[in-house]
């Protein structure tokens, strides 16, 4: 576990400020009262470390879905059970996911097994997205070296890269998106897995389109992002009807890619 006091020296992480919304703080108080843990996880923690102001907050807990519902009900909070079978309950407009292992492939697992934080982190895609902020103790829990990877702008999967990508092939495009957004590099195993199997088979056209648009918008250098995507074999899958020489595209003309 990495305590915030270790992040305070004047370096690129000294600006860490995770400004948690008041409604989430209230939810946290209810969980703490019931002796259950509540963590902020993923993108919000990553962005705060980078000095950005997070817009979305994903929450994770050791409480089972029925326990989450009971805590919320006793606290007078509105709940939605739309993802209960997958370990996700919406409380006060915020998704709260129980620590779990996903059984099956794809965006929606066939079933889940509940676990602890060590088990939960193994199902996540990239190390930089597998950071937890413990609201009880004011500490970042980093079990996979995500902070060091952020420091190096290194994009690396959690565990075996081929297995993570096989679970959901869209993760391949996500890895490339974060590489482009950070202006960083792919980890060796992660890059090798992408080169060996860039296939996006089984992923809907809509998900591919949305991820591609997001990648284009967030890339620090659009041309370099497109060059790498082409080199790894993604553009011919994303835009199969277009015969375009990627290296000669002006990065300001990427809108042409979105009209498909």
What is each residue range found by the language model?
Residues 2-260:
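Catalytic cores of the polymerase beta-like nucleotidyltransferase superfamily
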């Amino acid at each position: 576990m990495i305590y915030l006091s270790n992040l305070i020296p004047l370096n690129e992480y000294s600006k860490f400020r995770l400004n948690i919304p008041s409604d989430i703080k209230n939810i946290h108080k209810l969980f703490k009262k019931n002796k259950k843990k509540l963590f902020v996880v993923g993108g919000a923690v990553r962005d705060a470390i980078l000095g950005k102001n997070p817009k979305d907050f994903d929450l994770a807990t050791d409480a089972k879905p029925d326990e989450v519902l009971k805590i919320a009900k006793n606290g007078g909070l509105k709940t939605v059970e739309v993802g209960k079978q997958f370990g996700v309950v919406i409380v006060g407009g915020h998704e709260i996911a129980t620590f779990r292992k996903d059984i099956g492939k794809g965006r929606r697992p066939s079933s889940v097994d509940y676990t602890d934080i060590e088990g939960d982190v193994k199902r996540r895609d990239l190390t930089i997205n597998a950071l937890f902020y413990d609201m009880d103790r004011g500490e970042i829990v980093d079990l996979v070296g995500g902070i060091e990877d952020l420091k190096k702008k290194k994009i690396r999967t959690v565990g075996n890269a081929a297995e993570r990508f096989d679970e959901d092939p869209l993760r391949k495009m996500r890895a490339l998106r974060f590489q482009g957004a950070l202006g960083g590099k792919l980890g060796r195993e992660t890059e090798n897995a992408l080169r060996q199997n860039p296939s996006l088979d089984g992923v809907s056209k809509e998900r591919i389109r949305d991820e591609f648009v997001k990648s284009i918008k967030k890339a620090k250098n659009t041309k370099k992002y497109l060059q790498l995507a082409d080199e790894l074999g993604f553009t011919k899958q994303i835009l199969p009807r277009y015969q375009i020489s990627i290296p000669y595209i002006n990065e300001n003309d990427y809108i042409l890619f979105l009209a498909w």
